[in-house]
Every structure is written in structure tokens, then in C-alpha cells.
């Protein structure tokens, strides 16, 4: 169905630019001033007051892994909950956050693609295999900033992704690469240009036999390699409707199958997205967006004996359907030079439920669980900027209403249908006020000083509210009484740009996340615990709870330099997040949140000229704790990646990519009886590229 829908959209996308060309032929004056760019409204002048890092298309193409999560690692402080990427991680662990603001795997940073929020409607994680990097033209990462303009979820920051610019795309592109462990990566795209519009169609496929996630000293006969297979496709059309209005349509879909390295640990994700956006570029700028997202997720879980000789199935999360719908309207009135005002409203509704089989006896499930609900947020926002001489002032705010409905947790005996749990959770609702104020001043030409203060908020995901889960022998109970997270923060920084090819930025910040949701240790196995059932002797029982707060202070440095074909860039984030806790979580007071390293560093040195390129990227992650009690730590890790591209003819080229060149051990997790998992070992790729038109 996804492929059929993409084909239909491509036909429509092709017809729209053709129709625009026909109109132009009939009336040449109708299109002489039309410039179709496929982007949203212009960026706000007030962004000068924020800590913003941009990643351009050239840098995106040079990722050694070819994956979005690796590209984002160029921005120090932006991290997933775990260090593993989307070839071996459980998808539910792939939430994004910044500045050590976390506590669990849900995203605290808002990822937006062409204006559409991308977090999974049920669980808040990011489906990274859905985003082939050749479809991306620009990434803008805003550290901090609150929820004012972008909406709920933009607590620790925002990642804005724009689709590839047709001016930078060939008519036909194809890439084919073969890598370590029988890995295959293939991608192809086509571009149709017409006066007044364009259309693109692209597809990507990745597979591999995978590596053994469990480190050598922890392995047993039950451990095996973790293969993966992933596919995505997207169709996009942009057409001018008159001289000042653009119609942008997008349709995409993906499938993602992974394994976690033992029997009964396969997981599968599927999704499809559709969106329509109208952009008005006249004196009154405006934007109107509507979107639909559907997701399906399934995952198996296993228990491995102490000798790691046998894996036994413990849970089958056989289906987790989820849907997200929403829209956004924004207006930019003409106020004259130096003034910018945005007024708008947005809405997002998500619904979903997990369907699971558990409590296996003689290899057969004896119980069934269904849990889920619906969440709705809608809000009004305003954002104003004033530029007067060397100073830019910005002030914005929003008010949101939220509502949780249809929350339920039902468990029953499969053989008889007898209910074990029939919890119907009451409807909840509330109002959140957030905003941002900032100033940027350029006292002398190369120097810009900036400061900002902001508030943001995030509604708990349906996954956090209603679904218990397991990781190895450990189990975590849901909590339908969770409150929204609320963040307050201040930033101060300086940007130096003494020349066109050089820049340096430094930012200090203080953030406080009130009501931070974390997985709080509440017991140890063996034993039977509320919300999860039996936990084995090596297992830990945790409950999702609102902590009093997480306070994080830190420093961020970013530098770039380019001279002719040679360039370098570096990014360093140093954070000190600390838990503020009392009551049942008092033992966590003063500790660091799980999976939050003090230091993250990335540095790249490269050369580009005439289609040829070579670069190396060094990354370092400091020691971080596996658990909320800071009793288990993951060792620091330093990796080196390499990339080289050489044109053979005008259309053909060769690529060589190497991930983790020195095969460093990158620890990603510790579970059960000190079983350590690792991220991707050394992986080498050799590929061919085709570019025409």
C-alpha cells in the first residue's frame, strides 16, 4: 500500500509541474517572477539570539555511516539515549536530547522535517531509517530555546530538517555500496523539473548480517550476530500556484527490521507519512500545514540464563499501531524593515496501543496485555523580533491546552479470557504557558554577544503513561499519573566571525527540568512486582516517576574554518546534569541522570574540490552511567571515521567509507548480571555513485 501511494503521488507530482509549464506557455508573464524553492517561511531574525548550528548538504553527504544519527553527532551535546545506531539499537531507545536533559529514552528535542514533527506518536522515539541522507538539504540544530515557536516537545532544543534543494540535485542519482559483514547499501533518486515546479522520487535500501552486540567476555552460546534490513521511499512535489504561493506535498514510507543478538529479540517498524503545506511569499507571508502519520511496531523479548546458553521468550509485543495527525497555521504580517512578527496556531493528536503476549509457560504465552490511549495538544503562539542598529531583540510566547483520554491497561488470561487487570484511567487535561526572550548585540563587526531566557514543556508519551517494558532481565512499570515536564533555562554566548571562512561560538547555559520523567529503581529480583510481574534474580525493577527536577549547567563550543578546498570544524559540549529528588526517589538526589556523559566532542578535517572529497572525523564520548543509581558505568569511547570520494568520469564516481577505523569498543548498555553491549565495530564500505543531469 505504501509503494502504491508513493507511485500515485509521483504521478500527481509530475502532473503539477507540467500543468504549471502549460500555464506559463499560455501566459509567459504569469511565471516570470516565480521562484520555487520548496522551503518554509524565512528563518526568524530572532534566531541570532540562540545557539544555532547548521549542517549543509555537502557535510551530510560525507557521513561515514550514511545515517542521520551519525550526521547529527557533529553537534556536540546532541545525543540519543544510547550510543548504538539504528542498525543494532532497539528503536525505542532512539530518542533525542541535548544538554544532558533526560532520564529515559523519550525525546526532549523536537525533530521537524519540512515543518512536520517526527517523533513516534506512541513512544516519542525517532525512526532514523526513514530518513535517507540524500533527501536532506539542510539541518539546523537549536540548542535550548523552549517551546514558544516550535511547540510542545522542544524542551532541550529543536532539529529542523529541510528536504534537498532541487538546485543542488541531479536529474538522476544512484549509490551502491558493499561493506563489512555482508552489508549492502543502495539508494536512487530522480528529479523532474518544470517551470513553476518540480517533483522528486527516491528510495533507499540497507541490509547487513550485523555484528554480535554482546562483548566477547560476556558472550555465550546464546549470543549471535544481529542482522538488519531497512527500506524507505519518498515522493515530493512542489508547484507554484500563481506568483506568490507554493503547494508542497510529501509522501514517504519505511520498513525497518532488526535483531538484538539472541533468539526471540527481533523487532519490526513500519510507517507512512503524508503532508500538504501551502506557503505564501507575498507581503503577507503565511503558511498552512496538515499532516498524517501512521506507525506499526512489533518487538520480541527474551530472557537468557546466567551461562548464556539458552534464550527463552518472555514477551511478544506483536503489534503497536499508532497514528499522529496535526496541522499548523502561521502568518507573517508586513511591519517594515527591521521588524518581524509571527502569529499562529498548531494542533497535534496522537493515539496508539500496545498489544502483547507474555508470561510464557512451556514456550507458549498465557497472558495478553493491551495498553494505550490518546493525547491531544493545541496552542496559539506569537514570536516578534526587532532589529535596531547592532541589536536584535526577540520576544515570543505560547499557550497550549492538553488532554489525555481513552487511557487503559487491560490484561487477561489467554486460555479463559478471565481479566487480570482492567484499569481505565480518568481523563486529564491542563494548560501550559511558555515563552522566550532574547537579545543579540554586535558591538564591533566580528563579535556578537547574545543572551536568552525561555520556558518549554513536554507531555508524557503514551508509552511512558501506559506501557510497561523489559530490557533483558530488567523491567520498568508504566505510570498513568505522570505529569508534564517543564523546563526553564537561560543562555549566554558570544560568536566571533572575523572572516568569511572562519567562525567561533561559545555558549554557557543553565537549565532546570521540573518533573523530569525517569525510570526510578524500586526493587530487585527475584520477585513479583506491580505492573510488570515476575523479575528474575539478576533483574532490577523500576517505575517511571516524575523526579523533582534535573538541573544541568554547561558550556558549548563550536568552531569552523575554511581556506579554499580545506576545511575543519569542531564541537565540544561539557555538561553537569544533576538530579534533584525526594520522597521515593530521594536516593537519586545529587546523582547524574542515566546515559548522560559529561563531555561529547566531534572534530572534522577535510578537503573538497571538483567532485573529489576526503575527510576524517574524530569523536569522543566521556564515561556515562547506565542506571539511575550511578552504580554501573559505560567506559569512555573515542572513534575515528573516514570518507573519500573520487570522480571517475563526469557521471561515475567511487566512494570509500570507514566507520570506527581503529575498532574501538563503544559500550552501549549493561543489563542483568553485568552483561555489556557494544555499538558498531569497524565497518568499511566501498561504493559507486552515479550522477546525471
Please tell me what each predicted stretch does.
Residues 6, 440, 451, 484-490, ...:
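Conserved C-terminal beta-signal and adjacent last beta-strands/turns
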Residues 68-71, 94-100, 112-114, 126-132, ...:
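N-terminal periplasmic accessory domains that precede
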Residues 69, 73-116:
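Extracytoplasmic beta-strand/coil segments of soluble accessory domains associated
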Residues 116-143:
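Short acidic/polar hinge/loop motifs at secondary-structure boundaries
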Residues 147-148, 160, 167-169, 175-177, ...:
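Periplasmic-side early beta-strands and strand-to-turn transitions of outer-membrane beta-barrels
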Residues 264-282, 316-325, 372-375, 421-442, ...:
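Outer-membrane beta-barrel signature, preferentially recognizing the C-terminal barrel domain
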Residues 294-298, 351-360, 401-420, 427, ...:
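Surface-exposed extracellular loop regions of Gram-negative outer-membrane beta-barrel proteins
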Residues 387, 393, 503-505, 509-513, ...:
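Gram-negative outer-membrane beta-barrel transporters
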